[in-house]
Swiss-Prot record:
Its cofactor is [4Fe-4S] cluster. It comes from Thermus thermophilus (strain ATCC BAA-163 / DSM 7039 / HB27). HAMAP family: MTTase_RimO (MF_01865). This is Ribosomal protein uS12 methylthiotransferase RimO. Keywords: 4Fe-4S, Cytoplasm, Iron, Iron-sulfur, Metal-binding, S-adenosyl-L-methionine, Transferase. Binds 2 [4Fe-4S] clusters. One cluster is coordinated with 3 cysteines and an exchangeable S-adenosyl-L-methionine. Belongs to the methylthiotransferase family. RimO subfamily.
Length: 434
């Protein structure tokens, strides 16, 4: 049977693309191989967002060519084929993000499909995450024009899925053991705008392609639902009652990027110190336990020490639960590259370190508030007898903290258990099964 090697790079949205490609390949009869040596061809799903990701992708392509020789490239960097072929002219094919059919065509030109996919009534689905959680992509592309970003050039304009299609996928995942659905998009809160929020039928029920209506129906599946990449639109407040009622996890991943109004204008992003705080305060009034994650860019062109201090002051006052930070890196094709007053690399790194130091204090302070409380924990791992590693509603996999739990030895991966918190670290919690 024909064997395919697969390398998946980039964000959770790219991971969903990888799962779709692998599911289609499996339906065609291909097997996946964990080694270059056994594979007859290798697919590399690339990232092309920042320079470091571009270089990582090019290196991965080079390694696959060296170890195997037959390589098909897809993903965000594939939207710039000249970049790939300049370094690696011997790749078999280059396709852009989300171009599943073109990937399949490129593979079949070299390795004919082992079987007719129509022999299977229900094609198998391949997951690259553990069985108990899964990423579900609501839309592709983005209509924003942030000056530091080229995602609209790589992935195109916003293209949402019908709500019934999303719900059908979610229901299939839950039926096969998924306990947590992580909803992703380039801009989750814009879901359905391009469709005019049209209705589609899920069973015999009409559901609008609008986030609140979608979540209301999805909540009936009875699993954790986590929202990622939520642009801070005013209508986000409409989702909060679902969190207050326990239908959706009280967790929002909101990439604010900065707090200085001047820098945000240069970034073509909304808000600023005061408006950010006002928004967060309003959300917390509805859902006091709301966990907030955000990402920030330091060292953006023109960022002064005063601008940076505004950001530090904001972090102290906002008390976000989780924070990611990037030192600004020019992205080929981004409009921000033309801005004056670039920040020296050493200053970028120094500011990044200072920001992380401030957030570490905030994170520890927030974590300590949970000592003595009992939290529900979703078990991710069982590294040794009597010990489990899991996550609370405050923790997305791979990017947030974890909870180390002393257990009675009977818990299973994917199980939700009550845990009494005994101790807090800067990012993680320690507790005992209650």
């Amino acid at each position: 049977m024909a064997k395919i090697g697969f390398v998946s790079l980039g964000c959770p949205k790219a991971l969903v693309d990888s799962e779709q490609i692998l599911s289609r390949l499996k339906a065609l009869g291909y097997e996946t191989s964990p080694s270059y040596e056994e594979a007859e061809l290798v697919i590399v799903n690339t990232c092309g967002f920042i320079n470091e990701a571009v270089e990582e992708s090019l290196e991965a392509i080079g390694e696959a060519l060296k170890e195997n020789g037959k390589v098909v490239v897809t993903g965000c960097l594939g939207a710039r084929p000249e970049k790939i072929r300049e370094r690696h002219p011997q790749v078999l094919a280059v396709t852009g993000p989300g171009e599943v059919e073109r990937v399949l065509e490129a593979v079949q030109e070299v390795l004919p499909a082992p079987r007719d996919p129509f022999l299977d009534l229900i094609p198998p689905q391949v997951k690259l995450t553990p069985r108990h959680y899964a990423y579900v992509k609501l839309s592709e592309g983005c209509d924003h024009r942030c000056s530091f970003c080229i995602i609209p050039k790589l992935r195109g304009r916003l293209r949402s899925r019908d709500a019934a299609d999303v719900l059908a996928e979610a229901a299939r995942l839950v039926a096969t053991g998924t306990k947590e659905l992580l909803l992703v998009a380039q801009d989750l809160s814009a879901y359905g705008v391009d469709l005019g929020h049209r209705e589609s039928l899920w069973g015999d029920r009409p559901v609008r392609a609008e986030l609140k209506d979608l979540l209301t129906h999805m909540a009936e599946l009875g699993v954790w639902i986590r929202l990622h990449y939520v642009y801070p639109y005013p209508h986000v407040k409409d989702l909060l009652p679902l969190m207050a009622e326990g239908k959706v996890l009280p967790y929002l991943d909101v990439p604010l990027q900065h707090a200085s109004p001047r820098i945000l204008r240069l970034m073509r992003r909304p808000g600023g110190y005061e408006s950010h705080l006002k928004t967060l305060k309003a959300w917390r009034e509805v859902v006091p336990e709301l966990a907030l994650r955000s990402t920030f860019i330091v060292g953006f062109p023109g960022e002064t020490e005063e601008d940076f201090q505004i950001l530090l002051d904001f972090l102290e006052e906002a008390e976000l639960d989780r924070v990611g930070v990037f030192a600004y890196s020019p992205v080929e094709g981004a409009e921000a590259n033309r801005l004056p007053d670039p920040v020296p690399e050493e200053v970028k790194e120094e500011r990044k370190a200072r920001l992380l130091e401030v957030q570490a204090r905030v994170s520890l302070r927030k974590n300590q508030r949970f000592v003595g409380k009992t939290l529900e924990v979703l078990v991710d791992e069982l590294p040794e007898p009597g010990l489990a590693v899991g996550r609370t509603y405050r923790d997305a996999p791979g990017v947030d903290g974890v909870v180390y739990v002393e257990t009675d030895g009977t818990v299973r991966v994917g199980e939700r258990i009550p845990v009494r918190i005994l101790r807090a670290d800067t990012y993680d919690l320690h507790g005992v099964q209650a």
